[in-house]
């Protein structure tokens, strides 16, 4: 069990290391933090914390740095709340006050904002189509025996599909197909559709032939597992600013990881959209390329349903209190904006 004095020493070491990226010695803690004890006492506490696995000593330094266990204990037990400052508040407010009419643009801007306020690499998953609820289906004639089927969802996510229109199908019948599809699908979540339900719908509307078959085949494809995640990145270049990634091999590994969207989706946990902030630190991520990184994520929603996730990727040595408060603030604003689409 860590006593109160060890807690204070560990918190001081972590916060100093986060600020300076330099190993921390007992004299530094005694001089900069009013702990009310001598450097010798602090040195003894640091030795104990190292023995317990919360600190590590780099080979080339007399100072200590936090271990993975030290960071984990900090975020679970010691991390203070840190309200976002006025400049961050104003940047967030002004971004979401802009008249953004496209969901795609909104998510891209949110990724840029998250990166700008945290100075880390930001990743946001767009609303997942299979998590969305059908709102309306429209059909727009394109000419040359083709039409555009538009699937509109409550999350603002829109899927388009170009379909071939049989020669005998009139404009009125096209509208009837759209109305019938809307009637059968409105209010239903995409992921709750089953192939059995789609086959039943096909039988019921069979007289519309190949046009309907194309629409239902499109929806069946949306039920298939695979590349379902739309990811938006911001501030990848921030990796270059971190002392941890002056090692070219480490940097190359992280940048290579960021190019693999399915791997990024897996680390963000896009298949487990659970409430709240989640922090993964170093070895907890179980990827060699991210051994020196942390990933912090939060979810956003439409109404009472979680529809997507946002997060930052950076060194383990990150300002966790700041990152958590900014993530919560931006997720809240994005959730409010989604209600407008």
From Swiss-Prot:
Signal peptide boundaries: none
GO BP: negative regulation of DNA-templated transcription
Disulphide connectivity of cysteines: none
InterPro entries: GAF-like_dom_sf (IPR029016), HrcA (IPR002571), HrcA_C (IPR021153), WH-like_DNA-bd_sf (IPR036388), WH_DNA-bd_sf (IPR036390), WHTH_transcript_rep_HrcA_IDD (IPR023120)
Keywords: Repressor, Stress response, Transcription, Transcription regulation
GO terms, molecular function: DNA binding
Keyword NAD: no
Organism domain of life: Bacteria
Function per UniProt: Negative regulator of class I heat shock genes (grpE-dnaK-dnaJ and groELS operons). Prevents heat-shock induction of these operons.
Family statement drawn from the similarity comment of this UniProt entry: Belongs to the HrcA family.
Name of this chain's protein: Heat-inducible transcription repressor HrcA
Organism listed in the record: Symbiobacterium thermophilum (strain DSM 24528 / JCM 14929 / IAM 14863 / T)
């Amino acid at each position: 069990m860590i006593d109160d004095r060890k807690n204070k020493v560990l918190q001081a070491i972590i916060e100093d290391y986060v600020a300076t990226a330099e190993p921390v010695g007992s004299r530094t803690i005694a001089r900069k933090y009013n702990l009310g004890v001598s450097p010798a006492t602090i040195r003894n506490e640091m030795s104990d914390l190292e023995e317990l696995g919360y600190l590590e000593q780099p080979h080339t330094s007399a100072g200590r740095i936090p271990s993975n266990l030290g960071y984990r204990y900090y975020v679970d037990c010691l991390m203070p709340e840190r309200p976002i400052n006025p400049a961050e508040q104003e940047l967030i407010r002004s971004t979401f006050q802009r008249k953004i009419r496209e969901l795609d643009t909104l998510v891209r801007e949110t990724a840029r904002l998250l990166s700008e306020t945290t100075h880390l690499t930001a990743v946001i998953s767009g609303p997942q189509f299979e998590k969305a609820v059908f709102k309306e289906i429209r059909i727009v004639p394109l000419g040359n025996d083709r039409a555009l089927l538009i699937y509109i969802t409550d999350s603002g996510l829109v899927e388009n599909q170009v379909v071939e229109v049989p020669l005998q199908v009139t404009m009125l019948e096209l509208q009837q197909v759209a109305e019938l599809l809307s009637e059968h699908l409105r209010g239903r979540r995409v992921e709750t559709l089953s192939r059995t339900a789609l086959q039943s719908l096909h039988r019921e509307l069979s007289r519309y032939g190949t046009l309907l078959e194309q629409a239902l085949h499109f929806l069946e494809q949306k039920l298939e597992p695979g590349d379902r995640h739309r990811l938006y990145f911001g501030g990848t270049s921030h990796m270059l600013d971190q002392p941890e990634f002056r090692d070219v091999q480490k940097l190359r590994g992280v940048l290579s990881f960021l190019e693999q969207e399915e791997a990024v989706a897996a680390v963000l946990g896009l298949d487990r959209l659970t409430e709240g902030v989640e922090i993964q630190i170093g070895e907890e991520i179980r990827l060699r390329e991210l051994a020196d990184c942390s990933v912090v994520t939060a979810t956003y929603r439409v109404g009472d349903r979680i529809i997507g996730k946002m997060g930052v990727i950076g060194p383990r040595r990150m300002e966790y209190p700041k990152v958590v408060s900014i993530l919560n603030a931006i997720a809240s604003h994005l959730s409010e904006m989604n209600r407008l689409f």
